[in-house]
Amino acid sequence: MRRLLCLLTLTSGLALANAQDVLAQDQGPEPQSAASVENVSIPATQDIAASDATAQTTHQVSRMLSQKFGVAKAKAEQISAAVMSAASKYSLPPALLLAIISIESRFKEKARGLNGATGLMQVVPAAHRKLVRNIDLTEAEANIEAGSAILHGYVQSARGDVGAALKSYGGSTAYAEKVSLQVQKFTPQTEPATAGD
């Protein structure tokens, strides 16, 4: 008898709990307290501002590539977007990548150099077989991605010494100095305009 009474009590308790769950689902979610509303994720104004600044910088670079280097508008937009993306991904200054591209290929995607160096950043496939396997180095995004990854690896190997990394990338101290001079020319184009500009 006790068992039967216990079973009935347990069953009715479960039925009541189930009914409350169904009722709660019908009424929708519970109202949130002020404390729980504070934890709601809203895109930060800073993130939006950073995104706008990146878009503005990409546009500035694109315009400069068209005007100074004669790159077609659509191609300039593609190159500048790829540079900004790779710069962000590999924590490299966009001006550095642009300086390398200007020296290596003068922004000519199909450029060919010594030892099979190919594309905008003159990546040498034989020296980086694993990295560039099955990649079309004459395609802007792929070339900038590969060249930036290579440069990033050199910077890491040199423990952050960009000059030493450039020497590894280009093969000489003179190359590193030449790139450094070009970086100074590209830096104003890769910095977001301020309100007073």
Q: Which stretches of residues belong to each language-model region?
A:
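Catalytic glycan-binding domains that act on GlcNAc-containing polysaccharides
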Residues: I42-D197
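Sec-dependent N-terminal signal peptides
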Residues: M1-V22
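N-terminal propeptides/low-complexity segments immediately following signal peptides
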Residues: Q20-A44
